[in-house]
Amino acid sequence: DPDYLPFLDGADSTERRDGAQNTADAARKAGITSRSVEETLDDNGSPVVTLSPSAVDNLWACPVCWLLENRFAGPRIGSAATSFGTLIHAVAQKGSAEGLDLPGAVAGSSVESAVDAVAHRLVDIYDAIKPDFSSIAKAAERYTAMLKDEQAETTLHNLASYFVESNASSYLNKNEGKFDIGTLESASCEEEFSARFGLDDICMAYNALPGMSPVGRTALMQLMGILVGGWPEGMREDLTVRLSGRIDRKEMRRLRDGSQTIRLIDYKTGRKRQLAEIFNDLQLVCYQLGLMFPEHGRAGERPHSAQSGLFYVQDDAAPASSYSPESAFQPPLFLNGALNAEGFVARDHYPRLDKFTDIPPLPAGKPSALDAVDDNAWQGFLSWNGTQAMWSLTMIARVFYAAAASRSHVIVAHPTRQHKGHCRMTDVCPACAGQVDTVFETRQA
């Protein structure tokens, strides 16, 4: 089927899929290119950095490794494992287009038989579009592809379980009564988005917090710098961030009270991450920012986003699973135009926000470097410590960090603990090899 040719080219990661789509659309969509990071200037001469969501994720994890893999390396060949990921994305999209995820998709059946029927159809779709794995030249790649192929039925049964059971009253298990995900009305798959925002936009959301004494852009930049361990030298207060990519699955759901809400789902077919990584995932953060600051959307639109989650379809039958479905979902960054100041929603086994967050401790006294922050602003900032509002600001600060790091000539690298645990570049990145923090400098003749 020609509609699925883009999924069969060996690309897998969200970044590569975004790049492939952007290349195809370059002639008709100005400003979206195949590069995962690009810098331009706006009409005032201020920098505009365009990033894909996965570039944000990787730059925050370790900017040196990102440079080595993306700026100082040639094109990477797709693997059997990555091709499998894009196949699953294609099957999920086709299944949703056929309405297999809607309530009552299989009429007159029990939940179990409906799951089996939907899984059978998803396997048929998979079999129709998968390539001939026996034709892969390299033996190791051929073996990996065939191994993945054997796992497809289990993976697609997990996907079918979500399609059917997420509309059932028993879906949330021990999270029932703690929060509501509603009933699916429609889903948009592989939806392109582009977002554009700067510190002025974040300042408005920060100052809209209850009881907050307003701060200016310079002060907010200094406060956000505390949350990321200091800014790269490429950070400027007039920096504009532009995000471009595709959302795997955007759901419109109707809640029990009659209100409508949006859920964002990102499919994953690789290694399942640790709990904090799932909750703090920056690709999901980028999708949320795409809803809040659409580049071409109408000003003032603020859609209500409820839960966002990573869906490890090889391991789980629901997104953000931990003990019960959805326990590790990512909460909204914003509510009613402000940073999310609501209390944390307790989940099965996780009654407190600090079970998920990885925010470093804040100093009690105001650092001397924060010369644009007065005492009232500092105390106002500290008053949100340990809340979802501080978590939201931290996640947004990491996106700005990634944008600043991508345009920096000198980078002091502080790789995240999670990245160092599975880094592929330890032979060439001293910071990830467990040595001292690395200063990486690029020079142009």
Where are these regions (language model features)?
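RecB-family 4Fe-4S metal-dependent nuclease core
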Residues: 1-445
